[in-house]
Amino acid sequence: MAPRSVQIVLFDGFELLDVFGPVELFGLLPEHFAVTFLAPGEAPVRSSQGVTVNADHTYAAAPAPDITLVPGGLATREVITDEAFLAWLRGHGTTARLVTSVCTGSALLAAAGLLEGYRATSNKYAFRWVETFGSTVEWVPHARWVEDRDRWTSSGVAAGMDMTVALIRALYGDDVAAEATGMAELDYRTDSTQDPFAALHGL
């Protein structure tokens, strides 16, 4: 069986760990996952931490993926007003077998119409802002991550790694998930409802 293709949607100002936490885990399992990066154009994309990434494909040239992942970051406040980006994301998301997000990436999914009728979560610090998007999204405040059919969304930043472990387990079982977490020496949460940050931010 060929590895599942995982496409990471990049934009200037994305949150670094939103991307490279999951990429670390996927990358430890090359027989199961093949990761590529997407960008608006040919130029490198700069994270909010100043690290630049060269993408494999432009948005326009991206093939249909098995899994797409949309990160968050402070720049989502600007990106979410880009109607051309949202239109592209809407079309791209419909070609993916699984649509996932980390942090405020779920706001982008919601604004693109990709979470209508789904349960979802997001970064708790920004939750009140995020939940203004998507008319029929059921936003879940007390969740480390939420799986709803072909949509997976996580809470803020590091929570993306917990979601990724759960996704790997769902696709390939406990042994493969344990292989990745063992190599990464990752102490992760297995209960998606354990989220201390919801209470911390008054949710």
Locate predicted features.
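Extended, subdomain-level signal for the structured scaffold at the beginning of enzyme domains
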Residues: 1-99, 106-111, 117, 128-142, ...
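Short amphipathic alpha-helical segments and their helix-coil junctions
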Residues: 6, 147-148
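Anionic-ligand binding patches
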Residues: 120
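Short, acidic/turn-prone active-site loops that include or flank metal/cofactor-
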Residues: 124-127, 145
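A short glycine-threonine-serine/GTX helix/turn-capping micro-motif
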Residues: 149-156
